[in-house]
A protein has these predicted regions:
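Cleft-lining beta-strand/loop regions that shape enzyme active-site pockets
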Residues: 1-122
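C-terminal, low-ordered peptide segments at domain boundaries
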Residues: 1-18, 144-168
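Conserved P-loop NTPase
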Residues: 112-117, 126-162
């Protein structure tokens, strides 16, 4: 639902903004499909994330719609931003759709597969998460153990003010 809500917000408010401020500080992630859908609002059609397994086999997650805005994204990040939030921020950088400000993100560049009763009949009420893939953002960069390096390092107590200034918002 997150990706759908994000796109509806962009579609309904694009004429009222000069830039989109996306605050992902402290966001531990979520579904990769939501990150791809949100990123697609800025980038348009294309392969926006790549998963590579231990054998080197890769698969792309593609966004097949058109971009919903020509305005840039200004993404706020910190060390608590991980996983799908890093996919979004790294994708913004990789597609040239905007900038990232704040501090370096967590650096979780891997994805897990969940095995539970729905796909593994011998787990009776239990579940197991197995790290199965390393992911690469649009542009080919991994965040694993590195994080997303911001375009501009900004102390967290100044990040929102900096984003507003960069967006051209009148203060």
């Amino acid at each position: 639902q997150t990706g759908t809500y994000f796109q509806e917000g962009v579609r309904g408010n694009d004429s009222a903004v000069r830039a989109w401020i996306v605050d992902l500080r402290g966001n531990g992630g979520g579904l990769t499909s939501a990150a791809v859908s949100a990123l697609g609002a800025f980038s348009g059609e294309g392969d926006l994330i790549y998963f590579v397994d231990q054998d080197g086999e890769s698969a792309a997650q593609r966004y097949s719609g058109k971009d919903l805005t020509d305005k840039p994204a200004i993404v706020l990040m910190d060390s608590g931003s991980a996983s799908a939030s890093e996919i979004f921020a790294g994708g913004v950088l990789g597609t040239g759709s905007g900038i990232v400000i704040g501090t370096r993100s967590y650096g979780k560049g891997v994805a897990q597969v969940l095995y539970d009763e729905s796909n593994c009949p011998y787990l009776h009420g239990d579940a197991v998460k197995v790290t199965a893939y390393r992911f690469y953002c649009a542009g080919g960069n991994t965040t694993d153990r590195i994080g997303v390096v911001p375009t501009l390092y900004i102390p967290q107590d100044q990040a929102v003010a900096a984003a507003r200034l960069l967006s051209g918002e009148k203060t």
